[in-house]
Structures are given as structure tokens and as C-alpha cells.
């Protein structure tokens, strides 16, 4: 498995909508809108994103999935030079680029199909299209028949058994890799594509770029048919997409627990597939419009980021933006967004997702850990992931009241909540009784008990919770330096709590840093540990 994908946090953008392009590609001038993406890079970095999946960017008639030319950037977005600049800036910022590969079908304005329309039987491109024949007309008024994608005759199915077609498509992909340095492809309508084409595509891409990632859009069926050593690396996890939101709406965690265990548990059928996980996208109603209770938004994303696979956030949904299809149209799901004039947004949700992204980056169990269910109830769910000698628990409570969840932990270990201020939970007789507030979650790392500083007096008659407080005294930084904490102050304007500390050997060296930074967990040598630990 490629190392980068196990650490990936995706941000999905539909460029034509995001950039405010006209809905139809009329015969107008080329306009550079795609460079708008560059302005969003600081936001992506703040959110913890390290990979973007961009919807169609190549010349098309309307929505991008009706390609006119695989070798040209859509003139509503810009040109190859502008897109090369965007990809370069993303890569400089440590963000990988995955493009939409629409190879099952093209639009009716695709140049080779236009040749067939103009030259009929005399066109050398008749063999480029699936089941094209002159034995009857098409529903679009052509004097010939052709296969279309799911009956949409504005989307003409390509004949991927034709070597000329395959060479044309691979030539385009090769130019995207060479010119833009792309890191992967999302394959549209993958269930309709000839498997032999995927074999050729895999061989072609991996030869040019061994860590190139291929992910197929699969809605139904056995994911192993497409994601295997001969074809694709991954698929869209629509099974869990549905289970995640409906489990919260129906207050029934058994639904998503069944899917997670079926896919990734002991004997899981997709344990060898690093699935692409999401809670909304350009084709389905936005999460904020689907969830019946907005209080569940944070738990949904906590589940998304802590389950096996690569999490993806659809642009705008990090702020809880709504979006519902209208009259069968997907365009309301694909708005133009301006960072400087956003509608009312949920900043708390965005900060929560940023925190989850950091945990994904730092915690090996969230990258490659196995999956084991610990507690499954209608309104509570606990699962455990382990890798690299570390174990991590996710505990979710969707109820409107607090919950207490009891389960066993490894002897000699305590649990540290790396999502919530590093609270420490100590077991009693090998089990921990974990309190979880309404509509909330905990993400807990198992740590050796002797590594955790405990107060001298602990009242074990109460729930064994030892809050991680910043008290005056000596602390060791994870890099080995020692500092003397003087206390906690507040910023005079923002009122943000700041930890004030100094060098014990040189009192002239004084620092004031955000409390949240002081308490956070960092990845040091492949292991998660507190940034500062009291001596």
C-alpha cells in the first residue's frame, strides 16, 4: 500500500461550480478561473488537507462529464498553463492532486463523434464508439445508433476494446502526469468500464509513477471486483456513506457497525482495500441537509476520520453548508464559494475537522490500524484500532443525554483522550468506565500508566478521570528540553488562554503559547505523545 494514501485527508472540489463558471460552455473567450484554487491553499492547510480530488477540468459542453477534448483545460476554467501553475502551488504546499478520469463516455461534441456525425459511414472514428451502427437512428435524431451511459444519450459510450481509443486516452493521462504532475485518478462510472482498460491504465500509470493512485466510483457490488492487484487501488465507499448518516438519523449505530465489521473486522471482505470514505459529494445531498439533527455533525466527521480508509471532505461541508438537489439537478450541490463572502458557517465544525486531520496525521492506528468492535448499542459505539504497537479507541454517543461505556483495556495501560484536552482515564480491575457527553465522542490512545503524571490523591470512588491540567512546575517538551510553567494567562484582545513558561536556566527567555497547542499530541518517531509532559 502506498504510504501517502494512508495519511491522506482529501478535499473534494467540483471546479466548474467552485470557480463560478457558466453552466454551458458557449463559444466565448477562455477565462482563467482555476487559479482561484491557489487562494484557498492556506485554508486547506489549516484544515489539515494534504490531497485534493478535483472534479472534471477538461474541455466539455456542460457539467464536465461530457468531455469534448481530453487534452485541453475547459476554457471556462483557463488553460494548461494556468492549471500547471495551480498544480505546482498545491504540490509546493504538500498537497497531492487527484483528477477525475471520465473514460466510460464522452459528450456529443467530442471531436471524434462530431466526425461521425459529419461523415457518417465514411468516418474513420465509427469504431471508437460502443455498438455504433447505421441500422437505425438514435433518440437524439442521428441516422445511427450508439450506446449511452445509463440511457443518457448526451453521454456517448466509448469502445474501450478499440486500441486507438485506449491509446488516445492513455496519451492524455500521460500528458497530465508529465505536465501537471498529478498523483492519481478517480475513475468515473467505474462499474461500466471494460476491466481490460483498467489493467492497461494501471500498468501505464504505475510505470510512470509507482505511487500513482487509482480509485473507482463504485456504488453497488463487490468492491474486490475493481480494487485488486491487477486493476484499481481503491473505490468509493458508498456502503458506509449511507450507513454513517442513516445510523445517526435513525439512532441506530448497529447499521454502520454492521458495515464496518463486514468490511474491516475479523474476516472483513475489504480489509485489503484502503477505501475512499465520504459523507457527501457532488452527486448527493449535502450532509447538513441530510442529517435530521445538526448536533450530530461532529460525530459524523469523527466517525469518518477514525474508521479505516481515507477521509474526504466536500468543499463547503467543513462549515456545515446545506445543499439539496432541485428538480433532479445537481447544480445546487456545486456552488461557487468565496472565502471572503461566505454565507453563515459553522466555524466550530471546521475546527473540529482540523483537529481530526491532525490526529489522522499523527496516529499510526488511524492510518493502518485494524478494526475491532468493542461496544455496539443503538446510540453508542466504541471500536478499537491497533497498529505499530499502539491502540486507539473511538467512542461515540449520539444520544441527547450522557452515556457511560464500560470495557476492558490492556493491563498496565491508561486511556488518554487526544480529542478532548488529554483527559486521562485509568482502569479499575482491568476495565474503564468511560463517560461520554451528549452528541459527542472521545478518541483515546492507550498509554503506559507510568508515562502519565497523576495527582498524588485520586478519589477512585468517583469515575476514575484525571483531568490533564496545566499547573505551575517543570515540564518536558517532547524533544527533550525542560521548561518551567508559571501559569495560564489570557490574550488581552481575544481572551484566548495562553500558557506562560520560561527556561529554568535563563529566566530572560519567556514564552506565551496557546493552551490548545500546549496540550496537543504530536507524532514523534512514529508514536503519539503529549507535546509537554509534567515532571
Where are these regions (language model features)?
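Mixed-charge, low-complexity intrinsically disordered regions
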Residues: 459-535
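N-terminal structural segment of carbohydrate-active enzymes
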Residues: 1-99, 104-106, 111-115, 151-152, ...
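Aromatic- and acidic-residue-enriched segments that line the glycan-binding/catalytic groove
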Residues: 30, 63-75, 103-144, 203, ...
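Active-site-proximal helices and loops of the catalytic beta/alpha 8
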Residues: 117, 174, 178, 188-270, ...
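The substrate-binding groove and active-site-proximal loops of carbohydrate-active enzymes
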Residues: 16-34, 66-80, 151-166, 183-192, ...
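Conserved, mostly hydrophobic/aromatic
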Residues: 13, 44, 54, 70, ...
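C-terminal beta-strand-rich structural cap/linker in extracellular carbohydrate-active enzymes
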Residues: 427-460
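Carbohydrate-binding surface patches
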Residues: 374-408
